[in-house]
């Protein structure tokens, strides 16, 4: 990106650091991972989990959720002020699964939030360690991104289900800070803004008074985050217009939807981070590995190496395919829900299938599901190669006025062609140039029309052998052009919010 110099790296966002050099960043990210690992070990002790039970991803999710809820200040305040029957605002908990007499049993545990906060701080040298909390939020968000399709949410805000590749991070909580904002897709930001504008249309006082001033500040901040994701001057100019609007209304919603559509070809820059479940970090720390000393990065080989040597298990429902469950979690661990499946198959070394072809539901088990028929199996999270993560959106030339990877939001900096029928997307723009911004719109449409689908993104970039830690010998994969590489496209995956 042109303004890269003014931006902090992901790792700095991840660790709230001021400018640091690469070694310091690796150390501070490592420190964050150490903290999560130590916390997880302590929780497994508290809950008396066996080694196997501690490596069960469902237990990991419950423990992660408990600490996130213990630190959710706003919700905790809300619960104190609006007591609801049967919910103790001071407690947090969830299902913990244990192996008893050859069967999996569900046990509901309840802890004081204060106690959980104490254990977390103790594991993090007395700090609140917000970066570690955000890291877990992003892991949950990546898991949601691979598990559910957000068609319904898209349609509700007046967007098109075809925009699902723009929805990264759509389930991240608002409190996820700079690191969270970095991984949100263009569609996610547009949706948050549209919801805000709609509230303003329906509620006369939304922008007024003391509260309205804060609201307005939040609105402009969100506009700036979205503007920073766009890589062409015309898209950014339209964002300025949306931000400066005296009284945001339907015209702004129209502009935002137009911008979201344009991002299908002129991709935004969206960060990708490998955030792994706590049950991966825990055993690594327990085995004596020192992440802070060794250094760790979320965007290089480190997560691949860690997964290569990790044992993680999952509960499996009677009619689920363990290999498919593994693919789901593998994609989440590599934040690759919107990456090209041809590329993922190459990196993983086994075929990666679209969501609708997978015989698996989500990783979480609902409280009313029957445990008697539950089995467990090992998740296969290893990869054949590793690749460097990207946030560029895959646009092919330096002015960025070119085809990004259409219908995919690239997660890896690896050469690929653009396998998608551009005319389908362009059809969404025909005849819709009225409105105040027609000059900018015309400019954006012109750039999109000039985007050549036969171009190659990330030219010359390749994947690497796992033994090639310094990334010296790129292997540039060759792909079958005829295959379209999107995971959700034309798919019937389960909805996140049904």
Swiss-Prot record:
Region Disordered, annotated ranges: 1-21
Protein known as: Nucleoprotein
Species annotation: Influenza A virus (strain A/Memphis/101/1972 H3N2)
Motif, Unconventional nuclear localization signal: chain positions: 1-18
Post-translational modification: Late in virus-infected cells, may be cleaved from a 56-kDa protein to a 53-kDa protein by a cellular caspase. This cleavage might be a marker for the onset of apoptosis in infected cells or have a specific function in virus host interaction.
GO cellular-component term (any): helical viral capsid
Subunit structure: Homomultimerizes to form the nucleocapsid. May bind host exportin-1/XPO1. Binds to viral genomic RNA. Protein-RNA contacts are mediated by a combination of electrostatic interactions between positively charged residues and the phosphate backbone and planar interactions between aromatic side chains and bases.
Pfam families, per database record: Flu_NP
Function, as annotated: Encapsidates the negative strand viral RNA, protecting it from nucleases. The encapsidated genomic RNA is termed the ribonucleoprotein (RNP) and serves as template for transcription and replication. The RNP needs to be localized in the host nucleus to start an infectious cycle, but is too large to diffuse through the nuclear pore complex. NP comprises at least 2 nuclear localization signals that are responsible for the active RNP import into the nucleus through cellular importin alpha/beta pathway.
InterPro entries: Flu_NP
Keywords: Capsid protein, Helical capsid protein, Host nucleus, Host-virus interaction, Ribonucleoprotein, RNA-binding, Viral nucleoprotein, Viral penetration into host nucleus, Virion, Virus entry into host cell
MF terms in GO: RNA binding; structural molecule activity
Motif range (Bipartite nuclear localization signal): 198-216
Family that this chain belongs to: Belongs to the influenza viruses nucleoprotein family.
Biased segments, Basic and acidic residues type: 8-21
Localization per record: Virion; Host nucleus
The organism's place on the tree of life at top rank: Viruses
Any single GO BP term: symbiont entry into host cell
């Amino acid at each position: 990106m042109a303004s890269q110099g003014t931006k902090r790296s992901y790792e700095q966002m991840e660790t709230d650091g001021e400018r640091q050099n690469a070694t310091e960043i690796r150390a501070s990210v490592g420190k964050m991972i150490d903290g999560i690992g130590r916390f997880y070990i302590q929780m497994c002790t508290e809950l008396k989990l066996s080694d196997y039970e501690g490596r069960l991803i469902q237990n990991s999710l419950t423990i992660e959720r408990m600490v996130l809820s213990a630190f959710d200040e706003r919700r905790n305040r809300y619960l104190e002020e609006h007591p609801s029957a049967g919910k103790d605002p001071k407690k947090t908990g969830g299902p913990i699964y244990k192996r008893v007499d050859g069967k999996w049993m569900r046990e509901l545990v309840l802890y004081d939030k204060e106690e959980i906060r104490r254990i977390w701080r103790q594991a993090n040298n007395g700090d609140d360690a917000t970066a570690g909390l955000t890291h877990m939020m992003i892991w949950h968000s990546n898991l949601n991104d691979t598990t559910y399709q957000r068609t319904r949410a898209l349609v509700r805000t007046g967007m098109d289900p075809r925009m699902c590749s723009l929805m990264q991070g759509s389930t991240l909580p608002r409190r996820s800070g700079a690191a969270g904002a970095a991984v949100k897709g263009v569609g996610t930001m547009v949706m948050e803004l549209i919801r805000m504008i709609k509230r303003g249309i329906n509620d006369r006082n939304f922008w007024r008074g003391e509260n309205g001033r804060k609201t307005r500040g939040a609105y402009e901040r969100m506009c700036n985050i979205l503007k920073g994701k766009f890589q062409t001057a015309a898209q950014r100019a339209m964002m300025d217009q949306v931000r400066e609007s005296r009284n945001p209304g339907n015209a702004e919603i129209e502009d935002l939807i137009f911008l979201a559509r344009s991002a299908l070809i002129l991709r935004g820059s969206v960060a990708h981070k490998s955030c792994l479940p706590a049950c991966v970090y825990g055993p690594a720390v327990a085995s004596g590995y020192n992440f802070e000393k060794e250094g760790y990065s979320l965007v290089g080989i480190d997560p691949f190496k860690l997964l290569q040597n990790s044992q993680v298990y999952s509960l499996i429902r009677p009619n689920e395919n363990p290999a498919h469950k593994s693919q789901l979690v593998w994609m989440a661990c590599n934040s690759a829900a919107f990456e090209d499946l041809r590329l993922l198959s190459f990196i993983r070394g086994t075929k990666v299938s679209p969501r609708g072809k997978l015989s698996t539901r989500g990783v979480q088990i609902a409280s009313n599901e029957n445990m008697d028929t539950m089995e467990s199996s090992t998740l296969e999270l290893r990869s054949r190669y590793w690749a460097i993560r990207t946030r560029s959106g895959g646009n092919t030339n330096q002015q960025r006025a070119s085809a990004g990877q259409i219908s995919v939001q690239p997660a890896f900096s690896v050469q690929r062609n653009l396998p998608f029928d551009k005319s389908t997307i362009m059809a969404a723009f025909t005849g819709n140039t009225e409105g105040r911004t027609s000059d900018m719109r015309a400019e954006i449409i012109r750039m999109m029309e000039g985007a050549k689908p036969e171009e190659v993104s990330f030219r010359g970039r390749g994947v690497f052998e796992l033994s090639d830690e310094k990334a010296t010998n790129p292997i540039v994969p060759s792909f079958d052009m005829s295959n379209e590489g999107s995971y959700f496209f034309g798919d019937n995956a389960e909805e996140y919010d049904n």
